[in-house]
C-alpha cells in the first residue's frame, strides 16, 4: 500500500456541492491498492451525543465507485445527501484485497475501528447552500465552437477597409490588414450553420492597431475597420436567430501603448491620473529597442513578454478593476454576448473574477466565463470561472497523433489526469482547441496529411470537452511555421508560437474549398450534437490501448446507450471486430471484409 498516494482535498474538485443538492466527495489511491472504499459521514454535532456507555459518533456509510482509472492511480467518487443541518463530517473507510481496513481522515491513516473513529478528525464541510453550487451552463455543453478572426474571415463592407489594405489573396505579413469585418461574418453565418456549428467565437473586436486586435486601445469601441456597434449587434442577433451562441475574446492584463491611458503616462509620468494603472518601475517610461519589433530590453515598466507595446495593467488598482467591470457589463447588457474568454485569466486576482461573475450573473444568469491561461495547467487551476481551455490535454492529443511523442497509454493517462482535476459538471463546458491564432495550423501540424487530421478531429469530438475549430480548418487552410536557418540543424516546431498576424485569409472560391473535408466536418458536428447527452454526461471508459501496435479504444456510456471508438495511431493495420448489432456512425480506412483497421483509421459505432 502506498500511503503517500492516498489524497483528498476538501472544498475543491474533490469535494463540492452539486446541482442536484448532493455533496460530491472524491479520493485518489494508488492503482490496485484497495478493493472497496466507503465514505462514513454524518452531522458534525453528532459527536456531542456520545454518552458514558462509550457510544461513538453516529455515522452512515456509502459505497464509493471507481470513476477513473489509469496505470498510476484509482479515483473514487460518492454523492452524499445534504442533511437538514447543511453541514457534513466525513472520512473514508478503505478495504484492501486482504480484508485489511483503514480509516483516512483529516489527520492520518489509521486502522479502522470504532475507537479510532471516535478520535478521528474528519473532514467537515462549511455550511452548504445553493451559493456554493457551480452554475452549469447547459447550453455550453451542447456547443461546437467555430473561432473567427474577423480581419481574415470575409470582407462584407469595403467602406470600412483600412487604408492600404492588402489584397485578399496575398500571403500575410506581420503588419498585414486585409479588410475582413463583422459584416463579412454575417454574410457567411449560413456556411457555419450548414457545417453544424452552433457557437461563434470571436477574437477581439475592440479598437486596436493590429489586424488581430489583441493589442486593445479602447475596450468601449468596436474597431472602425470591423464596422460599428450596430454591426456587432446585428451579428449577435443574426447568430442568435440561427441558434448560435457568441463568445468574445478579451485580454485584461494589458493595454496597447497607443491607448490614451498609456499616452497620458508617457507625457505626464508619475503626475498622470493613470500612473497607478500600470506596473511601472521607474519614470520616465522607456525601453531599449531590439531588432525584433515586439521585444525590447531595459524596460522601465512591466510588459507582456517584454513587448514594449503591451504595458501590463495593475489589477491591484481599484480603478482598473472598475473599468473592466464596466466593460464586461456594457457589452453583455447592450449586445447580448453569451460568453467571454478571458485570456491570461490565471494572472488575474480571484477576487476580481468572482466579482465579475457575480455582476454578470445579475444581467444574464446563463452567461459563461472561460479561462484561457498562459502558465498554469488550465485543467484544474481555475476555481472561480465556469470553464477552461484544456490546453495541456489538447497538446497531448496533438503530440500523440502527429509526433508519436505521447504513447496511447500516456494519452489515456493524460485524459484521466485532466478529468480528475475538474468538477464533473464543469468538464463538458471546457474547450478543446488544437490550433489558435498564435500557433501554426492543425493541417500543418499533421504534415499536410488529411487522413491524420480527420482522425485527430474525430478523436476530439468523442471527448467530454466541447471541440473548437479555427476558421478554415474545414478547407485545410494552411500557414507554414516561420523558417529557421537551413544550416542551424533545427526543424521548425509543429506547435511553434507565432504572430496572429501571420494567419491566412479564408478562401471562398468554390474551387479552393475542400468538399471531402467539409462533408466530413458536417458528419462530425451532426454526431456530436445528436449524441450530446452521452458525450457530455456519460462515462468515459478506456479499453485496450497498445503502445506496441499504436491503437486506442474507449467507450462512452450513459445508461444502456454506448458508443465504442477505436483509433489506429500505428504504422500498420490492426484487427478489429465489432458486434453484429452495432450501428456504424463514422469510420476511416475500415476494411470490413477483412475485419481490419488501416493506418490512421478509426471507427465509431453505436452499441
Language model features: what each stretch is:
Residues 1-33, 116-131, 136:
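Non-catalytic, glycine-rich low-complexity segments
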Residues 25-30, 569-581:
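Surface-exposed beta-strand/loop patches in extracellular or lumenal glycoproteins
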Residues 31, 593-607:
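C-terminal beta-strand-rich structural cap/linker in extracellular carbohydrate-active enzymes
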Residues 140, 156-178, 430-436, 441-574:
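Loop/helix patches that line or flank the sugar-binding groove of alpha-linked glycan CAZymes
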Residues 143, 149-198, 205-329, 334, ...:
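Substrate-binding/active-site clefts of carbohydrate-active enzymes
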Residues 144-146, 200-202, 246-248, 340, ...:
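Hydrophobic faces of well-ordered beta-strands that scaffold small-molecule active sites
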Residues 236-242, 254, 333, 343-425, ...:
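Active-site-proximal helices and loops of the catalytic beta/alpha 8
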